[in-house]
Regions:
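Short amphipathic alpha-helical surface patches that mediate protein-protein
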Residues: 27, 72, 117, 259-263
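A short, charged, Gly/Pro-tolerant segment at domain boundaries
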Residues: 249-270
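Glycine-rich phosphate-binding loops that contact phosphosugars or nucleotide phosphates
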Residues: 117-237, 243-250
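Gram-positive cell-envelope targeting signals
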Residues: 4-8, 141
């Protein structure tokens, strides 16, 4: 397939006024298109949804998902990795940590820990790569004496959400904030009265809109390279901030518990 950005520019003389608005928006906001709906694009470009559909047809594209895939492929061609592999990875990881740190709001962080500290029980929701962050969070907080349950599958998340109350908290990990199963479970938990803390890159996402506290990550979910772990690194940075703030507030208890855990683990070594 031809580079979609080149195709958009090559057809410029044939565009109507509405086409040019859509084309300009796509070229300017290509990094965000993969997380937008047809209605989002139309609204931001200042045209009707029908105008967006007609524009896509001119490109030979029938569905929005095909545009998103084309953009993801073309972006990869546009920004190939350069230099030694280890240096490229180091730069990517360094950038994502630095940028996530710049987005961290201390007041929101403290508010999130307040909710967790005074809750009856805490659940961590996440699927796929975000599930790794949720599972890591469970392990971290249990070691500090805070009962946390990580649920990594959508059906089980719904079951857990149905039994929550206003005394409970759900921490939801989702880079896009629009993962269907997780968002549905979070919405049900909110309906039951539970407080929602979201860890997401998109503060205007479906998940963020129903959250009591939003802790923003920097990494974007990629369609083509969804296996990259820079998104996970960003989530783990936020998780570690939560853990350290909780530990600071409960140091006496967590120190004693860590000593007991250390003894228990050492006793299992051969």
């Amino acid at each position: 397939m031809n580079n979609i950005f080149h195709t958009i520019q090559a057809l410029w003389p044939e565009y109507t006024k509405s086409d040019k608005k859509v084309a300009t928006f796509i070229l300017d906001q290509q990094q965000n298109i993969t997380n937008m709906t047809l209605a989002d694009i139309a609204g931001e470009a200042g045209v009707s949804e029908g105008s967006v559909v007609r524009f896509l047809n001119k490109l030979g594209i029938k569905k929005l998902i095909d545009l998103k895939l084309s953009i993801a492929k073309s972006a990869e061609e546009k920004h190939p990795a350069e230099g030694a592999l280890s240096a490229v990875v180091e730069e990517e990881f360094s950038d994502v940590v630095h940028n996530t740190a710049s987005l961290m709001d201390p007041e929101r962080l403290c508010r999130a820990v307040d909710l967790m500290e005074h809750s009856r029980q805490v659940y961590f929701f996440g699927v796929a790569v975000s599930g790794i962050a949720a599972s890591t969070g469970e392990n971290s907080f249990i070691r500090m004496g805070k009962p946390v349950h990580a649920i990594l599958e959508g059906h089980m998340q719904m079951i857990a959400a149905a039994g929550l109350t206003e005394e409970d908290v759900v921490v939801v990990f989702s880079l896009t904030g629009n993962t269907r199963d997780t968002c549905e479970a979070a919405a049900l938990a909110r309906q039951q009265g539970a407080r929602i803390i979201s860890v997401t890159s998109y503060v205007n996402s479906q998940l963020a809109r129903i959250s009591d506290v939003v802790l923003q990550t920097f990494a974007k979910e990629e369609i083509i390279n969804g296996g990259r772990i820079t998104g996970l690194v960003s989530q783990l940075y936020v998780l570690d901030c939560l853990k350290r703030e909780y530990n600071k507030r409960n140091r006496a208890r967590t120190v004693r518990l860590k000593e007991e855990i250390g003894k228990a683990i050492l006793s299992k070594k051969v």
